[in-house]
Structure formats: C-alpha cells, structure tokens
Amino acid sequence: MPSETPQAEVGPTGCPHRSGPHSAKGSLEKGSPEDKEAKEPLWIRPDAPSRCTWQLGRPASESPHHHTAPAKSPKILPDILKKIGDTPMVRINKIGKKFGLKCELLAKCEFFNAGGSVKDRISLRMIEDAERDGTLKPGDTIIEPTSGNTGIGLALAAAVRGYRCIIVMPEKMSSEKVDVLRALGAEIVRTPTNARFDSPESHVGVAWRLKNEIPNSHILDQYRNASNPLAHYDTTADEILQQCDGKLDMLVASVGTGGTITGIARKLKEKCPGCRIIGVDPEGSILAEPEELNQTEQTTYEVEGIGYDFIPTVLDRTVVDKWFKSNDEEAFTFARMLIAQEGLLCGGSAGSTVAVAVKAAQELQEGQRCVVILPDSVRNYMTKFLSDRWMLQKGFLKEEDLTEKKPWWWHLRVQELGLSAPLTVLPTITCGHTIEILREKGFDQAPVVDEAGVILGMVTLGNMLSSLLAGKVQPSDQVGKVIYKQFKQIRLTDTLGRLSHILEMDHFALVVHEQIQYHSTGKSSQRQMVFGVVTAIDLLNFVAAQERDQK
C-alpha cells in the first residue's frame, strides 16, 4: 500500500504554536540549534492532504512500506504485545433476525486485543516502525493526542518497551480510560472538548506544545502516520478474509482517524472487489460524504473514539462506497443490546456500527455476509452508557424504563421550583468585576449571555480564581476568556428526578428554554435562552419546604 509522509507546514500556514522547535520524523539531521529551529516545524496539521500513492491494482512489490503478515500465537507468549491481533469473528444471532436481516451478520471483536481495542494494532505498529527506522530510541518520550484508546495501546507498549508516555485527551473521555492510562504509567493531560482541532487548547495543539518543550519526544501522530492504515491492511483485513474464507459482501466500520476503514477497505477492494464498504460517522462530525450528510446544528456528541471536525490525513474516503450518520441514542441502545442479547461486552461506537449495519444490510440476501467491526470494550464506559443514571441524565433512558420506587417529588416539573430570574453577565465584563459581582450577590456561578440573551457559556468563581492564580488570565481580561462550556442543561418541563440525577454529578444545572426567531429572509432559527440556574440547595430547600408545609 504505497504512501508518502506529507510535508510539514510551517510559518504563516495557520500554526497556533510559536513556543519553540521540535524534531519531527525525517527532520533528525544534526546541525546547530539555529539551523534546526529554522528547519523544523512547530506543528504538523492532522488534516494535511494525503500524498499516499496507493491505487487499486498496483502490485504490492511497488509499495515503499515494510509489510507484515498475521502470525499465529505460540502457546506461551514472550510478552503481552503478542496478544495484539488475531481477534475472533463472532456470529450475531439475535439482533440481525430482530431487524429482519436475511444475510449473515458477523462481528470482528477487536476488544479481544491486549489493551481492549482496535487501536492496540496501530499503537504497536507505529512504535515498531519508528524503532525500525531509528526515530524512536531507548529513553525517548512518546506523546500522542488521542480519544483514549490509542493512548491505552501506546501506554501498554511503552510500559513493555520502557518508554515514557504522555497522553493528551479531551475532557469528555471516560474516567475509566484515564484510570487505565494512569495504571499503565502514562502521564495524562486533559483539554477542552469543544476546542477546535487547530486551536492551541485542543488535544492536538497541546500535544505539539509539549513536543516542542520536551527533549527527545515524538508524536507518532495517528492522524498522519502511514503505519495506522498499514496495520489494518497487513493484519486486520487478512484476518477477516481468512475467517470468512474470502466470502463477504459488506463491511461496516465506524470512522475516527480513518485508519481502520482505509486499511481494511484497500485490502478488501484488492482481494474481494464485490464487497461494499460502509462508513459510519456520528452526527456532529464532518467525515461523511456527500457533504450534505454533515449538515446539522449539532456540534458535540457523547459517543467516543469516532468522528472529527477535520478530515485526518490517513482517511481515504474514496474506498468507502456509502456513508451513514449515527446518533448517540441509537449508539448506546444498540451497544446495550449487543451486551444483553449477544453477550458481546463492547463500547458505544460498536453500537453505532451495528445500528447502521442493520439498515445498510437490508439490501443483502440469504447466503450473503456482512461483517461489522466492534472497536473496543465496555470496560471504558462503566460509568457512562452502562450506567442507568448516566443514561437518564443524558436523556437516553426514560423514567418509566426503570422500576425502582421514587420519592413523592420525583415526577414534579422543574417549573415547580419557582426559580428567580438569574444573574447573568456579558462576555465583555472583566474577570475582576465578575468576581466582585458573584461575591456580592452570593453566587458561585453565572451564565454568560450576549446582548440578545443567547447563552454563550458559564463562568464559575472557582474556575476564574484558579485561572487567575495560574496566570492564564488577568483581572482586567474579559470574562469571555474563561467561559466554561461543559455544563448540564435542563428545561422547565423536565422532572425533578432528572434534575436530581444531574446534581449527583454536577454542582449546578442551567435551566433553558428555546425561542424560535424568524428572520427577514423568511427563515427561522432556534435560540436557547437562560431561564435560571438551579443547584442542589434549591432542590433540597424545595423538598424541605413542601414536607414542612404538609406537616
């Protein structure tokens, strides 16, 4: 599968980092520090155009890459890294019938890899290739921006091989991933979930800043590294072909960096040209084609490990025959279904994949076969979609789905609380002034709204004070610099039970209502307006007052 590493972009190409030099692969020549600083890029875009030269029908002998073949495991493994690959293919028996599929539905269970996910394959391959070409040396540091699974795979390999490992991941990723990474000895840096990939605060941006500051450190860069799709071209795809005796009619895979679907699809196009490749992209991501599929007001989603706000270099969308969009509710519903009905202990993105597969495979007939990739394990999501409380809090379960006895106030509406008008601040007010206002009024937090009253985010007293103490902002800076966008929203028509679930995990919830605004063009848009801020104290005071009145 021929490929070339894209050239780095430097200087006035939108680089958000100006903090110092680093050594990138292919830029390791010796010279003076001044020469190196002049030659080496401060960051490399993860969405640079691919320069891969792979073409269907081109002989493998023309590939510039080192290729490996799947190997059977010995009875006693020399180390745990030998338990990466050779994952089982399992028939899905009940779900396919439930949704009226005529074809055979099979699952490639990638959570049987040593680290629990499909990303173990690329993590090991990137390290082995970097060792082979001399980029990675004993004592070096591996840094990687990741949604967690690649980080776990790299941390696992780093623990065995003896490298220092730093993982940079967005805040939305599960606490289980963080705990596993720490147990493997990795250092973890968290970044804002809503930061654009090309901003200095994103997981990509922070990783490159660390790369610039830490000597002998390397970003293996799953977004650009040819080892990512090569791992799947050489092993995953061959395993699928062997397990299916070369007979499959459709493959469905959810897409993150795109390495899995690119590597597998390229091999299948060569060996099994009639097989249709189906890509799964979450709503709020922009990976799918045609572009119209990506048009939505939604920008965030709960499912982890798939979807991006940029097109990774390694993703070859030309090998995908058709794209489907998936949403959080069906992802988690199908993941729970796979666990409950098939005994497959998989993660949320597996739910996305199977939810799409039961739609896409409707066109297949008896005697045909559809393979789905189940990327990771439920281990990473014990406190998320596996938890009824979390599902209720996010609105993916309804109260009536659960049978436990509820207190008298559980089904009352939030509007019963009789909330007073909220204290709000404009984004142009200074941090110092905002702190004075919050202290004077006795509040710990306040919504930040624009002149029209539309919600921009939240500011909390604690966050502002910590930012001031850390020197990230000055008292004279506008409060817009410390807006906090990771907060829970609730509506007046929601139940106090749902509010209770939110307040078990969060200090407050923002009560919002929606307005439909018509424009002079005749089009309309929906705007969220703030109605109030509710805390656990508000709920407790309401319950206590009602019970006191009843007595």
UniProtKB/Swiss-Prot annotation:
Changing T87N: In CBSD; decreased cystathionine beta-synthase activity; increased aggregation. It comes from Homo sapiens. There is a cross-link at K211 (Glycyl lysine isopeptide (Lys-Gly) (interchain with G-Cter in SUMO)). Its cofactor is pyridoxal 5'-phosphate. Homotetramer. Changing L101P: In CBSD; common mutation in Irish population; loss of activity. Residues 27-42 have a biased composition (Basic and acidic residues). GO terms for cellular component: cytoplasm; cytosol; nucleus. Its EC number is 4.2.1.22. Changing D321V: In CBSD; loss of activity. Allosterically activated by S-adenosyl-methionine/AdoMet. Activated by S-adenosylhomocysteine/AdoHcy. Binds non-covalently to a heme group that may control the redox sensitivity of the enzyme. Heme binds at C52, H65. Changing N228S: In CBSD; has significantly decreased levels of enzyme activity. Coiled coil: none annotated. This is Cystathionine beta-synthase. Changing H65R: In CBSD; decreased cystathionine beta-synthase activity; inhibited by AdoMet and AdoHcy; decreased homotetramer formation. The keyword rRNA processing does not apply.
